[in-house]
Amino acid sequence: MKGLYCRAGESDAEPKFVIQETSLPEVLGSHLVRVQVKACGLSPVDFKLLEDLGIQRDLIPVGREVAGVVMQVGDKVSFFQPEDEVVGILPLDSPCSGLCDVIEIDEHYLVQKPEKLSSVCVAGALRDGLCAHTALHTHARMAAGHTLLVMDGASSFGLMCIQLACHHGVKVLTTSHSPQKHTFLEQLRPSVVKVIPVYNGSSDLLPVVLEETGGLGVDIVIDSGVRLHEEESEKTKLLPHKHDIISVLGVGGHWVTSHKDLQLDPPDCRFLYLKSASLTFLNHEVWTASSAQQGRYLHILKDIVEKMSAGVLRPQPEETVPLYEATVTMATVQRHQKKKAVIQL
């Protein structure tokens, strides 16, 4: 059978995505589950993270968010049996590409998929759901009555954060990156308190947030990237400046950032200290990179798929791509021209 792999380029060279022949071992491991893949989500490969974790291969398997049907289980598997519909995220060191017809995965990375939830929907949204849940529950400890500012609420991750927060009785403010996204966010139900446009050049972020919170600032800020310096490149011009984020935080607030290389100067740290605020880095990969909190991770995955099934989380539908377009599609995803894609098998 065939799978999608990435041949990492030399230093700055573009990575190459190739369809490669692959096979599974004859004997199934005791705790492994053999799954026939129905849909697979594609997200950018983080080469730096793989390097940091010491995972180095000539061919890196691509496509990790999978949904499918159990075909066979190892003799010590207790959670699943053949014909079960399952969903999960392959660990970073998995030898399998999620884009194979059949994969092998440890039972502790899978949860049951509710019957009425489509494989395509869950494969496309599972990672964003995991990020949103980790940011809001694990890091920010959100509770009813809190105020939350989500940057770029129309992104797939931002939308998940908004829906999850509204479900828990949190007052949500968000920013929009274009007039179309602004309209989309204003029409969301349950509705957000305020949509703040940041595409006009001048950002009124601080005065609007202070007005909406009675001058107190928000309890939680979730960003999707930060501008570190005043000069703007085309890529970063819509991102908030780190000083703006610290300014909108209330006393005891939580800032959850996705910015891997965030640099704070002593005055920034002093400002955070004066507010007794905290900063957390959002790296959802720790759930599969370490087995320290496996039970909690499975509980989160289960909660996400149940909320999707119940209609609490309603991800934007992803258009499905046929398998023969996988290499081209993955190249556009890797260049961040497209956030993600779903391949239906």
Indicate where each model-derived feature is located.
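Residue-level recognition of short, solvent-exposed, well-ordered loop/turn junctions
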Residues: L28-G29, Q81-P82, A143, L216, ...
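Glycine-rich cofactor phosphate-binding loops and adjacent beta1-alpha1 units
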Residues: L188-S278
